[in-house]
């Protein structure tokens, strides 16, 4: 089963902030590979 991790924000060079709430146990994605993700977008104001 996946493990729930504390949410520490990572900021990408583009300014996008993200965190991994659940870290899976499968193989890591590589650049160019199609992935499936669930996300929540929020605005500052």
Curated annotation (Swiss-Prot):
In alphabetical order, the GO MF annotations are: peptidyl-prolyl cis-trans isomerase activity
Q: Which UniProt keywords apply?
A: Chloroplast, Isomerase, Plastid, Rotamase, Thylakoid
Annotated coiled-coil positions are none
Predominantly, its location class is plastid
**Enzyme category, top tier:** isomerase
Q: Recorded E.C. number(s)?
A: 5.2.1.8
Recorded catalytic reaction(s): these are: [protein]-peptidylproline (omega=180) = [protein]-peptidylproline (omega=0)
Q: Which family does it belong to?
A: Belongs to the FKBP-type PPIase family.
Query: What name does UniProt use for this protein?
Result: FKBP-type peptidyl-prolyl cis-trans isomerase, chloroplastic
